Amino acid sequence: MNQRYPSALLENAVNELASLPGVGRKTALRLALYMLRRDVGYTENFAAALVALRRDVKYCKVCHNICDDEVCSICANPSRDHSLVCVVENIKEVMAIENTGQFRGVYHVLGGIISPMDGIGPGDLRIDSLVRRVAEGEVKEIILALSTTMEGDTTNFFIYRKLSGYDVRISVIARGVSIGDEIEYADEITLGRSIINRTEFNLTSSNS
């Protein structure tokens, strides 16, 4: 049975909220009614924060992490080891690794992983900019910290092949993260140890 709404404005709000990932129509209705119970100032601040996020957030021109300026705070920090680059799928992985407090290098955010089933190929990722960073000569080690899935392993292999002609060490995080797990869901201790105990990448790494 279709839900009937006493107001078209309420229905519109529910429709928009229900378009968010993981939010069903019942949850969307509950959120919309919650907003109605709050004062107008709260709702205005909430909406303004979302608009500012979409309009004003920038992407670091070096690593593609999100930031408020042209370069993110990690890349701009002279105390970080800029010769050590950790390659991750998305921004959530940067946040997860930073929370471990075990990594003092910098990052490179690919924006996804190779997934033919989803129509995502190497050209859809920020692999070329990673190659350019390595070609500049400052990078001494690349840590591949992608999800331990078939897609993650495929992406690792592609990057390894792209960087094979450069004088750079390529390592992969230890398999403390279970096969099929995504980096962002690993606990901080396990993830931190996986980075510390990383091993050199080779053609059999994805099968280990």
From Swiss-Prot:
GO-annotated biological processes: DNA recombination; DNA repair
The entry's keywords: DNA damage, DNA recombination, DNA repair, Metal-binding, Zinc, Zinc-finger
Pfam families with a match to the protein in the record: RecR_C, RecR_HhH, RecR_ZnF, Toprim_4
C4-type zinc finger segments: 60-75
Keyword Zinc-finger: yes
GO molecular function term, any single one: zinc ion binding
The organism's place on the tree of life at top rank: Bacteria
Ranges for domain Toprim: 83-178
SUPFAM superfamilies per UniProt: Recombination protein RecR (SSF111304)
Protein family membership: Belongs to the RecR family.
Entry function: May play a role in DNA repair. It seems to be involved in an RecBC-independent recombinational process of DNA repair. It may act with RecF and RecO.
Protein name: Recombination protein RecR
Classification of source organism: Bacteria, Pseudomonadati, Bacteroidota, Bacteroidia, Bacteroidales
Name of the encoding gene: recR
